Amino acid sequence: MLETCKDLEQQGYEVTYLKPDKTGHIAVDDLRAALRPDTALVSMMLVNNELGTVFPIAQCVQAVKDYDKGILFHCDAVQGFLKLPTVLTGLGTDLVTVSGHKLGAPKGVGALYVKKGVRLRPLLTGGGQEEGLRSGTEATAQIAGFAEACRQIMADRTRLERMQAIKDYALDRLKAEIPKLEVISTGDAPHICAVTLPGYKSEVVVRVLGDPGGGI
């Protein structure tokens, strides 16, 4: 989102960036303080992809709507879609973006949730596909692959517990093998674990992870 915000600034828009704390959290009070009479859009991640921080989207939406119901709220849910016990449409957001590649679906396909009553101007015009929002022939195979990935994940009712168990096991093993290991992830998300290895050169770690049994 940062690069998109920079593009908007080049077009003359003013963008306010909220500073997170050391765990990546954004305070709802900081969001309230940043709102202005001319604020048009608020955009926030659902899950930080580096630290696993889960943002209080529902509370943030409420704060924004209490200030001005006309401000649109967009949530980048790419890292949290179907990986949290969260119903995205229950967050109260106006717009939600998700991506297929995070779920094992084909690359290059995603989805945009648009709340009923919200009107958007298309960036691509032409044939009027996808309800006029994105003209051009649809990538049917990618869309079908995305839908099937969602169906399979939603049918696996133990997936969240399994992800958490795998993360807990990995952390326990890492701590036992590497006493100096430091955990920097927040623990909010069940599928993200971030650590640092003091005293180990990054290129050595990368080389080890590239060996059989490892992965990058």
Where are the language model's segments positioned?
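Pyridoxal 5′-phosphate
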Residues: M1-I216
